[in-house]
UniProtKB/Swiss-Prot annotation:
Mg(2+) binds at D8, D10, D212. Belongs to the HAD-like hydrolase superfamily. Cof family. This is HMP-PP phosphatase. Its cofactor is Mg(2+). One of its GO terms (molecular function) is phosphatase activity. The keyword Transport does not apply. The keyword Cell membrane does not apply. SUPFAM superfamilies: HAD-like (SSF56784). It comes from Shigella boydii serotype 4 (strain Sb227). It catalyses: 4-amino-2-methyl-5-(diphosphooxymethyl)pyrimidine + H2O = 4-amino-2-methyl-5-(phosphooxymethyl)pyrimidine + phosphate + H(+). InterPro entries: Cof, HAD-like_sf, HAD-SF_hydro_IIB, HAD_sf, HMP-PP_phosphatase. Pfam families: Hydrolase_3.
Amino acid sequence: MARLAAFDMDGTLLMPDHHLGEKTLSTLARLRERDITLTFATGRHALEMQHILGALSLDAYLITGNGTRVHSLEGELLHRDDLPADVAELVLYQQWDTRASMHIFNDDGWFTGKEIPALLQAFVYSGFRYQIIDVKKMPLGSVTKICFCGDHDDLTRLQIQLYEALGERAHLCFSATDCLEVLPVGCNKGAALTVLTQHLGLSLRDCMAFGDAMNDREMLGSVGSGFIMGNAMPQLRAELPHLPVIGHCRNQAVSHYLTH
């Protein structure tokens, strides 16, 4: 059995209504009783995840912002990675040919330029929400990531624009079909999990991980046992065809797999 279990949240542990199911919570508690280290590896913000862990009384390590931050059980910052200020400036100030909304993250929270109530549906479980700002006045020195939310085809065209403008100065990935992220070079959940396992004196072979999107690719591909959700992005299955595919998040498939 693995010594550490790493879980993506959206599309993996969370059901389509963005809640954790009772079976899932019960399974997580049983893993802890068996001294398996729990790690939540997510694109969500550390502030939100710390709130969720507190509400559930769960002991878990946190990989948040798609690897930009790693926190210990006690909330100590173990690792940080920020976008270079010049990259953040270019992304924020450039006029992109897109209908997607832009969202900026730093240690203080989630920021965007206008109200988009529909996006808050994904945060009903925690109550976490964006803060409205003038994007052009955003401090550039501590931006963890920038993401664009919108139609997938539109985001695919935007991805080409971003590649042309940024070259090798940032890492671009889809954390969902409707969310394209701009991250620091070399920053991903797999790299962050490597940092965490070294801190814990473990190897990646000692880990199992579950995920559904392209931001899970490096993590799933590097651990001893990686599992792809039945509802995963087709691109993820194509990138990691050797990994087993389990059930759908709506059926709490992670819990079902771990208890059967």
